[in-house]
Amino acid sequence: MQIFVKTLTGKTIALEVEASDTIENVKAKIQDKEGIPPDQQRLIFAGKQLEEGRTLADYNIQKESTLHLVLRLRGGVMEPTLEALAKKYNWEKKVCRRCYARLPVRATNCRKKGCGHCSNLRMKKKLR
């Protein structure tokens, strides 16, 4: 039977499958046609994400049904140069010893009125 897979870009892919095919098989066919690795694919049908290990028949997917392909979001890794820049921005500061206001490195007096613009400053402590 023929089913359709619609991507978020609006492209529709036609696939030749059997009702007994597993979701892994469908993802492999999508990889053959589009080059998207199966571990990055999420298939949605009738508002539900299709789980690997189950068949098309388990989800009552029939001929000419349309599945929606969503790519899995990857994240959590920051580029080393960007991480160094973030650390520099967050940790190269001075702190007022009276009111704990964060100040730029070149500051000589506190910017807050509450501590009387004191000059009692220290470098911000680094995390261990």
Curated annotation (Swiss-Prot):
Which one Pfam family would you cite for this protein? Answer: Ribosomal_L40e
Question: What positions does the domain Ubiquitin-like occupy?
Answer: 1-76
- Crosslink (Glycyl lysine isopeptide (Gly-Lys) (interchain with K-? in acceptor proteins)) position: 76
Locate the transmembrane regions by residue number.
Answer: none
Q: Cross-link named Glycyl lysine isopeptide (Lys-Gly) (interchain with G-Cter in ubiquitin), where?
A: 48
Q: Name one GO biological process term.
A: translation
The record's listing under InterPro entries reads: Ribosomal_eL40_dom, Ribosomal_eL40_sf, Ribosomal_zn-bd, Ubiquitin-like_dom, Ubiquitin-like_domsf, Ubiquitin_CS, Ubiquitin_dom, Ubiquitin_ubiquitin-like
CDD domains attached here? Ubl_ubiquitin
Record keywords, A-Z: Cytoplasm, Isopeptide bond, Nucleus, Ribonucleoprotein, Ribosomal protein, Ubl conjugation
The chain's coiled-coil residues are none
Say which domain of life the source belongs to: Eukaryota
Annotated GO MF terms: structural constituent of ribosome
Give me the Gene Ontology terms describing cellular component.
cytoplasm; nucleus; ribonucleoprotein complex; ribosome
Family the entry assigns = In the N-terminal section; belongs to the ubiquitin family.
Family annotation (PANTHER family) = UBIQUITIN
Q: What is this protein called?
A: Ubiquitin-ribosomal protein eL40 fusion protein
Source species:
Trypanosoma brucei brucei
